[in-house]
Amino acid sequence: MTGRDKLIVLALVGILAITSVVAIASDRSDLPTDPAFGGTYVEGVAGSPLSFDPILAATNVDQDVSRLVFSGLTRFDRGGTIVADLASTFEVDPSGRIWTFTIRPDATWHDGAPVTADDVLYTVGLLQDKAYRGPFADAFRGVSVAALSPQIVRFTLPDAYAPFAGSTTVPLLPSHLLSVGFNDLARQPFNLRPIGTGPFKVSDVDSRQVTLVRSDDFYRTKPRSRAYLDKIVLRFYRDEAEALGALARGEVDATGGLSPQDAGRVRTLKGVDLFSLPTNDFTALFLNVRSTKSVFRDRVVRQAIATAIDRGKVLQVAADGRGSVADEFVPSTSWAFVRDVPRYAFSTADARALLDGADWVDHDFDGVRDKGGVALKFAIATSDEPARLGAARQIADDLTAVGIRVDVRAVPFADLVDRVARQRDFDALLVGITVGNDPDPYPFFHSSQVNDPGDDFSGYSTLITDRLLEQARRTVDQGMRRELFAQVWNAIATDVPVVFLYYTDYLYAQSRTLQGFRVAPVNDPPQRFWNVEDWYLKTVVRQ
């Protein structure tokens, strides 16, 4: 199950506009204080480190440190838009195949060496190594890269691919310090003593914590040239609950990745804010339309299912309401969201009316609707994780109320991915999906993706949607691309091969002693550090 711009739950999310960000606590950046340099910020994190190399980073700690220490040619800003980072500028030619990046002249590694095109070539070469199978494996597949000068690099794609800019957010590695191939990368001392280009650098690592110190020549903070905090300490805990206990005792300043059940406890802590950061992680019910015998072959049945499910209640059961109801492939805060598409408001009465009108009625009076001798029943396959299982049971209850019999088939997550999803061994599949910051629905709805390793779990495709999805991938202009997406969203909303249910939030608790944190959507947990160079603990009186 792969996709060019995603990680698997499947993993890599549509672009989010910040104007609608929902937070339990608001930004604290507007308080009447001015930031001052100094101070140590301590955050509790679940897990322990294996490698800080961004290509090898696997644990929560690895990924957090990697985000603080390294940077890429581009990055996502607060609103989810791709902007230049290590690059000063970038452009794409009219064909959509040739992308050219100019590296900013003031970008340096922590050892003072300049960032050059050689670093880009080296990093891309590692990601293109056949032995590498990590989350960035698809980012540069089939892409050729060349250095036009020490500061200019050019990527040539086999075909136009509008979301390619998102691939260039991949953190760069220093070619002057690492000359080994991918197979030897894991044995390098560099992995726990990395040299990067980010606002902080690793100072010390022990069994209890990793300490990072400020880089005094960080290009993105110029003209002040450095972050406000002196140090960031990431302290290791067994799990999120233990880290939350440390926050309650005042041992750390923040912790994240909290469960909805933790939210109530956070509210009892004095001087602590709870932030609910939107993500593009959505949960959906894919309806398998492949079999000619499937009840899902009838579009009215699919529309009735979408109408009968109380998404708000499903969200409450699965995530204590921490998130938002989903209506389409991207959230309402995305540039790709289209308001003018068919939506299915929860209504048991309307769902019953749809089924009655299509002659799906209880002819044999056994409590289950049927038509032509076929009972309206199916099984939902999902993971045995409590939140997902709770969602499945709530859906089953909603559908039972309109005369549809639903069984819940819960299996371990590994089995769900490797056997059930990949082999398409299900009637309906309830899963969580993460898509790239620049949305690409192609892997989920194109005819070429109906079998593994594609992600078209429903088996849905039409000639029209195929052409639209192909054209959207080739269209760099965002406005034109949105128009193409609008047609795709309308087709999916009408045909209902999948019922979008809800988006989840990332819960982050932080002491009010820290200032400068700004609420933003997070594509992944480390993205909470998106403006860490502006965080501060010390203040001076405003003049």
What are the residue ranges of the model-derived segments?
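Gly/Pro-rich hinge or "lid" segments in bacterial periplasmic/extracellular proteins
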Residues: V170-A227, K231, A241, T348-A353, ...
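Aromatic- and charge-enriched surface segment that lines or borders ligand/interaction sites
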Residues: S88-R133, L148, R154-T156, A246, ...
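Extracellular/periplasmic solute-recognition and catalytic clefts
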Residues: L127, S144-A146, S203-V213, R235-K293, ...
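Detector for C-terminal structural segments
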Residues: I8, L16-S20, T33, Q209, ...
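Surface-exposed binding/hinge segments that line
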Residues: I8, T102, F136-V180, S203-D204
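Structural transition elements
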Residues: F200, V325-H363, T382-G390
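N-terminal lobe/hinge region of extracytoplasmic solute-binding protein
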Residues: G44-P94, G125, I195
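Ligand-site clamp/hinge motif
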Residues: Q188, F218-R265, N280, D384, ...
